[in-house]
Amino acid sequence: MRIVIGSFTAFLLLLLQNSNAEIPGCDFFDTVDISKAPRFSNGSYLYEGLLIPAHLTAEYDYKLLADDSKEKVASHVRGCACHLRPCIRFCCPQYQKMQKSKCYGDMSEDELNKHDPFVNVTLSDGSVVRRHFKEDLIVQSDLAKPGCPRMYFLNHELPGNEFTLFENGSLLRHWDKVELSKREYCVQHLSFKDDSIRIAPHFCPLSSEHSRTWKTVAIVISLICIILTISVYLYVEKLRNLHGKCFICYLASLFLGYFFLVLNVWKYSSGFCVTAGFLGYFSVIAAFFWLSVISLTLWNSFSGNSSWLNRFLPQNRFLSYNLYAWGMALLLTAITYIADQVVKNEKLRPRVGVGKNCWIYTGDMTVMIYFYGPMLLIIVFNITMFVLTAFRIMKVKKEAQNFTQQQKTTNRLNSDKQTYALFLRLFIIMGLSWSLEIISFLLSKNQAWAKAFMVADYFNWSQGTVIFLLFVLRPSTLKLLKERIKGGRDEAGASDEHISLQNTKIDPSVF
């Protein structure tokens, strides 16, 4: 019995000893290693000119990681310095630079002479003071870095990159109003393009952001599927009617948009960043205008030869559609470019290529003016045209019941309805995908919603794959492709489901 009681007492003493090894009321990330600092007889330490009393010191045999797990290390004394003076939490040793999330050797004498050692610190009363990182603050450089292999940094001189560093050590990121603790960020000296060296905050990608690798995989598969779809439509003559040609132009625009997006993901377009941003913008906007062309031509096809649109279109309609789609995309790109050059208010500029992001800036609501706004208007237009076309089909079907050549008209109508249904599915997929993209942007500041829309983002990057499944891997297209490979001609009777609206108009007498 005595052995049991003795063992239990020893266990309690061990727990008590371990609990006393931590400084009461002091977070590990508010401490510094003071093992090498002078110690006085009363148990206090003098660290970097700061006297740390004995009750704010303790012996630790671990270090705390960013995820609050403990890593065993040699026993050492730590002091709660950040309760006595504001601290600044470095990623690396205090005189090293950081590049691509990695620490490099100490700065040279020339670099030390030209680097900016000051940071703005916001005090508890809201006032902002300029502080020297070494002389006025306690440097913490032995804490574990945030738990991610790749970190982003903020350049406060760029719009959308502003931040506030508080005296309690937390950092407020302005663009999404998120306050980061010292577990979630660190600062380090960084070389910038203007040859300056400044202290910049570094932090992990948002938890809702996607793996660059998986994002690339989704986009590259989409690009391959788009190429395959274009190839099939160019190879099979029957598919190269008016709708097929418009569809090919849509796919070409979409391909270029995704191509510049994947270049931006891997920073391959950094050498021509602004140009790549505008080319990507032009391509995506052009894809939307081509989608509007498809919805308009479908509506016109079911409206008969008496359609008012026919009076304004020349004989070569495909040329007119090219002038419209590419021309409108070019016009919006030109407006965006001019606004980027002449608008003085940073919050109203498109800011293409800002912050090494070779795309239009999406950090605030300005993107609604230049990108998502026009996109939304075209989506509304497409919805209108598809609804009008659906009503027209129902009217034609009803009138065709009393038509003298009922069988012929019904067959033609069924074929055209299949074409309409096919492109309607395309619009639903594309319209839904980009609508979710807009909603995702509007809710991006909310972490919970941002995570929920991760699936929508992957769906958006996989549009080319969905199109390939929808338009190529369908029985009618595969049948036409098989006959074309065998050397057969794409006669009208080859398939009952192929796109049939090239030269076909529903007889106006039906209406």
Curated annotation (Swiss-Prot):
UniProt topology in membrane: Multi-pass membrane protein
Extracellular side: 22-215, 267-273, 339-366, 444-452
SS bond list: C26-C80, C82-C87, C91-C186, C92-C103, C148-C204
GO annotation (BP), single: determination of adult lifespan
Compartment(s): Cell membrane
Cytoplasmic-side positions: 237-245, 295-317, 388-422, 474-511
Source taxon at top rank: Eukaryota
Parts forming coiled coils: none
Membrane-spanning intervals of the chain: 216-236, 246-266, 274-294, 318-338, 367-387, 423-443, 453-473
Alphabetized UniProt keyword annotations: Cell membrane, Disulfide bond, G-protein coupled receptor, Glycoprotein, Membrane, Phosphoprotein, Receptor, Signal, Transducer, Transmembrane, Transmembrane helix
Residue positions, PTM Phosphoserine: S495, S500
A single cellular component GO annotation: membrane
SUPFAM superfamilies: Family A G protein-coupled receptor-like (SSF81321), Methuselah ectodomain (SSF63877)
Gene3D superfamilies membership: 2.30.160.11, Methuselah ectodomain, domain 2, Rhodopsin 7-helix transmembrane proteins
Family per similarity comment: Belongs to the G-protein coupled receptor 2 family. Mth subfamily.
Protein name per UniProt: Probable G-protein coupled receptor Mth-like 3
Source organism of the structure: Drosophila melanogaster
